[in-house]
């Protein structure tokens, strides 16, 4: 049997990189996919941007250089896990397109997933009120408000979370990754 490019190979890991604004649904989708893949017996790990920043990138700020360093660190860890057969789900804003391309180019079997929701939707979802504070100028360097978010131009999968449910998003992810729905 011949495998297609996006089908998982036995003993071969992959990296699924979820990118998008804060509140778009990256962690929600990645967590739901993690649960589904775990239930199917897939060796899978979730690297959440907030957890990595807290544990591996403590001390970094939110300058472009610091954000790029954080993304590169996440990519390094994801690559190590994937080389050992793990399916790695990365949930990180990763706002700069060039840095994402650079990191993804070093990873085995990368899939870029653009988790997309308009600013008004992510603002409504923001229970901490960070977007409102950023829009009022109280939080500097806030991605999507006072700092840029460079959306992928050609992601492998584009999920509009204001139009689909988490369950539908997971179905689309499973199908795209070759696991069936």
Curated annotation (Swiss-Prot):
Keywords per UniProt: ATP-binding, Kinase, Nucleotide-binding, Phosphoprotein, Transferase
UniProt EC number: 2.7.1.25
Cystine connections: none
Reaction equations catalysed: adenosine 5'-phosphosulfate + ATP = 3'-phosphoadenylyl sulfate + ADP + H(+)
Keyword match Nucleotide-binding: yes
Gene3D superfamilies: P-loop containing nucleotide triphosphate hydrolases
Active site residues of this protein: 94 (phosphoserine intermediate)
Superkingdom of this protein's organism: Bacteria
A GO cellular component entry from the record: cytoplasm
First-level EC class: transferase
Matches recorded under InterPro entries: APS_kinase, P-loop_NTPase, Sulf_AdTrans/APS_kinase
GO molecular function: adenylylsulfate kinase activity; ATP binding; sulfate adenylyltransferase (ATP) activity
PANTHER family cross-referenced by the UniProt entry: SULFATE ADENYLYLTRANSFERASE (PTHR42700:SF1)
Role description: Catalyzes the synthesis of activated sulfate.
Protein name: Adenylyl-sulfate kinase
């Amino acid at each position: 049997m011949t495998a297609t490019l996006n089908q998982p190979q036995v003993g071969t890991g992959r990296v699924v990189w979820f990118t998008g604004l804060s509140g778009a649904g990256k962690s929600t989708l990645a967590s739901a996919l993690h649960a589904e893949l775990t239930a199917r017996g897939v060796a899978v790990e979730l690297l959440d941007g907030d957890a990595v920043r807290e544990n591996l990138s403590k001390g970094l700020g939110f300058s472009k250089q610091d954000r790029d360093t954080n993304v590169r660190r996440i990519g390094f860890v994801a690559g190590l896990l994937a080389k050992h057969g793990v399916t790695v789900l990365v949930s990180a804003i990763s706002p700069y397109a060039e840095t994402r391309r650079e990191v993804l180019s070093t990873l085995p079997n990368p899939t870029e997933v653009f988790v997309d929701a308009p600013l008004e939707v992510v603002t409504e979802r923001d229970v901490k009120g960070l977007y409102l504070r950023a829009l009022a100028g109280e939080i500097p360097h806030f991605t999507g408000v006072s700092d840029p978010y460079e959306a992928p131009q050609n992601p492998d999968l584009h999920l509009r979370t204001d139009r689909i449910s988490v369950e539908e998003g997971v179905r689309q992810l499973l199908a795209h990754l070759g696991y069936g729905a």
